[in-house]
A protein has these predicted regions:
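Glycine-rich phosphate/diphosphate-binding loop of Rossmann-like nucleotide-binding domains
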Residues: 1-2, 126-219
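Short coil/turn connectors at secondary-structure junctions
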Residues: 2-5, 34-38, 70-72, 93, ...
Length: 257
């Protein structure tokens, strides 16, 4: 029944934590890292399941592997298939021809706004002491202050962007014009991390002269994505922007999966 594959099941997640006090058994991370050829993961959250520090119970499973195994690229195809209604509005069962929605969005998966949580989860998955970001002063703020640093590196950006260009080489181009195009989506008019991401994009793009480049700010991109999805071929962006944009894009294809 497993089609020749050897299957190992690892109980884990929030419900498992409530029952056992552990997010998963000791040695599970090492097994996934050293023994598994592929990992298929179900939902890990459970209502009311949190660690003493407030983190989601089960986070060291999905987030720990994401950071601990350096799974840096979240590759999300967005495609509307024949006969599948999109979810833009219930009354509009068909706005685009299916062939007009066919793009791939690449989200950087280890840095950015989630970096502290990812690194903390990876440390926990390895049985090490949890990570906390260094203290930062914020002049002018009053009362309790919570913060999440948003580190973005040239190394992390360039390898994600390079994968985007390589994927673009394997595709037929954007649906509207068959042009091979990689779009850089950021907020480089505001944040330094995004300015570095865009510079990294420009550096990588010089190695792919036969692929067109495109730029957009994330706020404007959200309206372009739903208004003219046929323009997009491959999109590269940072962690949280990609998290939000791909959930939005899922309505173009009728759902998350």
């Amino acid at each position: 029944t497993n089609h020749g594959f050897e299957q190992s099941v690892i109980p884990c997640g929030g419900e498992h934590y409530l029952a056992t006090g552990d997010e998963w058994a000791e040695g599970s991370f090492e097994f996934c890292r050293d023994e598994a050829d592929a990992i298929f993961m179900g939902a890990i959250g459970f209502p009311g399941a949190h660690l003493p520090n407030g983190d989601l119970a089960g986070g060291s499973v999905i987030l720990g592997m994401r950071s601990g195994l350096d799974l840096y690229a979240n590759v999300r195809p967005i495609r509307l298939y024949e006969g599948v209604p999109h979810k833009i509005h219930g009354k509009f069962t068909k706005v685009w021809d299916p062939d007009m929605v066919d793009m791939v969005i690449l989200r950087e998966n280890t840095e950015g706004l989630y970096h502290s949580l990812l690194h903390r989860s990876a440390q926990r998955a390895k049985g090490l002491e949890g990570y906390e970001p260094p203290a930062i002063e914020f002049p002018g703020l009053k009362g309790e202050v919570a913060y999440d640093p948003r580190p973005i590196s040239s190394h992390g950006s360039e390898r994600l962007i390079r994968m985007g260009f390589e994927i673009c080489k394997t595709r037929k181009g954007a649906p509207v014009d068959a042009v091979s195009r990689v779009s850089c989506i950021d907020k480089s008019n505001v944040t330094r991390g995004c300015q570095l991401f865009r510079r990294s994009f420009d550096n990588v793009a010089t190695q792919y002269p036969n692929i067109n480049t495109d730029y957009g700010y994330i706020d404007a991109f959200t309206q372009w994505l739903t208004r003219t999805p046929e323009f997009y071929d491959v999109v590269v962006t940072s962690n949280m922007f990609g998290d939000i944009a791909t959930d939005l894009a899922s309505v173009l294809q009728g759902g998350m999966g």
